[in-house]
Amino acid sequence: PNQLPIHSVPLLSDRHIDYTPLEQLLAQQDFQAADRMTLQKMCELAGPDAVQRKWLYFTEVENFPITDLQTINTLWLLHSEGKFGFSVQREIWLSTGKNWDKFWLKIGWKTGNTWTRYPNEFTWDLSAPRGHIPLSNQLRGVRVI
């Protein structure tokens, strides 16, 4: 795969978060590590309590600066040939008429009535369905999209 030059996206943050580690993992197409890094950066955005517990409350996500969410999303889009990112997930969710069950099936988080198990049953490369990752909004029922 063609690696895009690092820093082809301005890494903007309203909360002085450094997105370079995420950019590097995505540039290497190490999507599993990038997914974990995405959650880590989102916990940093939420503050020290979230960093300690390593997951997010729905209410914390509501207060995220749009600048940071756009930076994370743009990095995912750019390094996945447009397949992965919050905006892709949102587009698919809207295309299902905001039906969560259809959405989860479409992006491969569920097969029939069975949830895809983390991490081994997820597909961590570009052969995954569109919108398959990042998983951050699956964890603890957090919806970023």
What is each model feature region?
Residues Q3-I145:
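Surface-exposed peri-terminal alpha-helical interaction modules
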